[in-house]
Amino acid sequence: MIVKTRAVVLRDIKYRDQSKICLLLTREYGQVSVILKGGRSAKSKTGMLFSPGNLIDAVLYKKGNRDLQLASDASLVKSPLSETPDLERFSVLYRVLDLVRYASGPEEKNVPLFTLVAATIERLCDTERDFQPILAGFLLRLVSVLGFTPALKRCVFSNYDLLGSIEEMQLDELLFVHDPGGFALPGSAVPMGATIQRVPVSHYLFIRALAATGSQAACPEASPEEVSAVTALLQEYCACHLGRMPHRKHLDIVSRLISA
């Protein structure tokens, strides 16, 4: 059947002479692998629309028993690639796309995830500088969408209020705990095998401010060094939990098609 769906292009790969295979994150169907016949031809009107990072309305010939669907048409909604070239924008964009590839699976509808990715791409399109806070916000919301929201209000071990304890004990450091995710007070009884990091209280306050900020609102202010450190922390936390997700069979399918 012919279906129309909004989609984010996660990846494109050359296929044979003039075609290409694309991995899409769609609103209605989750990840879908599609082939765009003649998509690399100079005469193709839609080939360039199926470029990584583009937000598009795609028309597909979809069959339920087929691993590779046929893309027939598309219209552009937003494209970070059409903005003024900026290496930092592209770096953030491709980190987002790479994470989403592993955070979602074929035919697994996840509207909150799609909404987050689409909103992040729109933010990248509408922002002229300071792209790292957008990445930090994306990482924090991604782990929440996937069900790994870190505890930000209370110590994950003692259940004491974190803000109150910081003020009362005049703390300048907290413990970041990867599993269970969240923050803990120094001196807490840490279970054997728990992965923890000592982090400045300023990291905690910035992450808490990010969590309270809507996806379309301006990111809280912080120094570039603070943003970079928090982004690295959240990326490590995200990778820790994504590494436990099941292997996605569509990646094998695409690899076999490329090598055919």
UniProtKB/Swiss-Prot annotation:
GO CC entries: bacterial nucleoid
Keywords: DNA damage, DNA recombination, DNA repair
Entry-linked Pfam families: RecO_C (PF02565), RecO_N (PF11967)
Keyword Manganese: no
Record-annotated disulphide pairs: none
GO BP, one annotated term: double-strand break repair
SUPFAM superfamilies: ArfGap/RecO-like zinc finger, Nucleic acid-binding proteins
Origin: domain of life: Bacteria
Coiled-coil intervals: none
Keyword DNA damage found: yes
HAMAP family: RecO (MF_00201)
Function comment: Involved in DNA repair and RecF pathway recombination.
UniProt record similarity statement: Belongs to the RecO family.
Name the UniProt record assigns to this protein: DNA repair protein RecO
Origin species: Chlorobaculum parvum (strain DSM 263 / NCIMB 8327) (Chlorobium vibrioforme subsp. thiosulfatophilum)
